[in-house]
Structures are given as structure tokens and as C-alpha cells.
Amino acid sequence: MTTSLHIGFIGAGRLGKALAWSFSAAGLHVAAVASGSGPSGSANASTSARELADATPGCEAMAAQAVVDRCDLVFLATPDSAIASACAALRWRAGVSVVHCSGVTEVDALSAARDQGACIGGFHPMQTFGDPAAAVASLPGSTITIEAGEPLNATLVALVGQLHCRVNRLPPGMRARYHASAGFTSQFINALFAEAARVWESWGATEAEALQAMLPMARGTLASIESAGIARGMPGPVSRGDVGSVEKHVAALAALSGHSLNFYRTLCASTIPLAVERGSIDEDTARRLHAVLETEPLQAPPESRLQGGPASPASQPVPPLE
């Protein structure tokens, strides 16, 4: 049972803190933590490790090797570039498991532990961790991508359930592609808001005023996507076949300096196949829109997106253990 696990963390940054606190709040035993800096962790616990331990009942700060020696399951929450070297610097054994928390790094980066008999895997929460305390509150309901063989896979699935999250299983070799996909709905949103705010600034509005207006609209769009799906939940003139409005947008943005017009053309063109998919515009309207945008038609997305319905088997909610 996961409740009997001694869980350890090597790396006490924002991700390590958020996961450790989440596990502890779920009734799991986070027994030890070490700094992720240095080849094998500092013999004297770093300030961040001590802070994490002090805020986690039953947890002690110690050197990285001591974490491995004490715990059944070790989370390697170091920067991506340090995963392989941090793992290789430690002595592992049969009966212990180690997982890294990177979305982009392959699990084979932990091969040094596997070669010594340990089980290895990946455990990547699809959530942002700018503020660890806020991340603890936002983690339930999120998806956690796991990759491991048995018996570690079953343990990780149970842990995801304890956190009231969803499991996403990833086959080997797909981590970079998977992690890139997350960017479209994470940091790329910042670029979209930045571009919109720059347009608002052209008439003297501030970024704060732009955000105050745009955030409720963005939340409404996300709610529509959640309830109706990607294509059917899309608002805006393209979804209505309003070629005239798009023409006016192009003319207005052409008068601005910078790359706003090219950005608009690229994004607007990518919504045309979605409007065709949902059946709200015909092929002739799609061609007219592309002509206004001076873009080439894109391949239409698969029809399966129209189906809505339950989540795919790869991303289902997992009930918590009793």
C-alpha cells in the first residue's frame, strides 16, 4: 500500500515542495529530502531542503545518498539537465524505485539506477508550479503523466489517485513530443495575451486594462471548450464565416508596427479547419477566408474531436485509495 511507503525527494525547488506537500496532505509519508545541487547532494542539507522538511510532518533534511538509503520511492526533482548526472552519482539497490519529474527527459536518463537493480519511471504533473503553495491547491483534478514498468507502474497509479488527479500513460520515446504539446496550452497563452495587450497599448490602454477585459473572455472560451469540445467550442468571426470582420481585422493590424498581422494571419488560418469541422462554414467560405489572410489551407483536424464524450482511456480519473 502507498500509505506504507517511505517517500523521498532529491531536489527541493518549487516542484519538489509542491509534490512533497501534496503527498503529505494526502496522508502519505514523505520521510526525507535533499538538495538537488551538487553531484550527490550536500552533506549539510541546503536551506531549501530544510525549509521543505520543516513544513512537512515527519520529514528530515539530509544528504542525497541518505535519502536513497532511507526511502522506498525517490523523486528526483532536479533540473532536466541534472537528472542523469544526479542519478549516476548515487548508489542504488534492488527494492528501491526512482522516478524523475521531467516532462521532456526520457526515463532512460535513470539507467544508472536501473543497472543497479532499482525500478525507474517518470512522474510529470501537467500543472504550473510558480508558487508551490498555490500548486498544492490547483493540483487535484490535474493530469499526471506516468511511465514505468510493473510493479512501479501500479504504485504510481495509486499515488495519482491519492492526489485526486488523472493518469496519463505515455509510451517510451514520446516525452519530448508530449512536453511540446503542453506548451500550446501553457506558456504560449502568455504570448497570445502579450500580443493582445500590445494592440490595446496602441490606443493608450494599459496591460492591466487589457487583462481585465480579456481574462473573463478567455475563461469563457475555456468553459466552452470543456463543455462542447475544441471545434464546437470555438467562438469568433471565423466560426461564423464572417469574412468581412476578418478583412477589417487584417486592415487594422496592417497599420500597426511589429508582427501583429503575421501572428493574426497564422492563428486565424489555423481556426478555419475547425470551423469547417464543426460545419459552421463551407469550403467556399474557407477559401475566401484564406484569400483575405493570404494563407494556404491547412489540413483539417480529425473528426474524432467532434465526438465530445468521456476522456480517452489514457487520461481517466483514478479513484483515491481507501
Where do the model's predicted regions map?
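NAD(P)+-binding Rossmann beta1-loop-alpha1 motif at the extreme N-terminus of oxidoreductases
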Residues: 1-63
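Rossmann-like NAD(P)(H) cofactor-binding subdomain of soluble oxidoreductases
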Residues: 55-134
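NAD(P)-dependent Rossmann-like dehydrogenase/reductase catalytic/cofactor-binding core
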Residues: 212-322
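Structural signal for conserved beta-strand scaffold positions within catalytic alpha/beta enzyme cores
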Residues: 35, 63, 100, 122, ...
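Phosphate-coordination loops involved in phosphoryl transfer and adenosine-cofactor binding
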Residues: 3-4, 95, 141
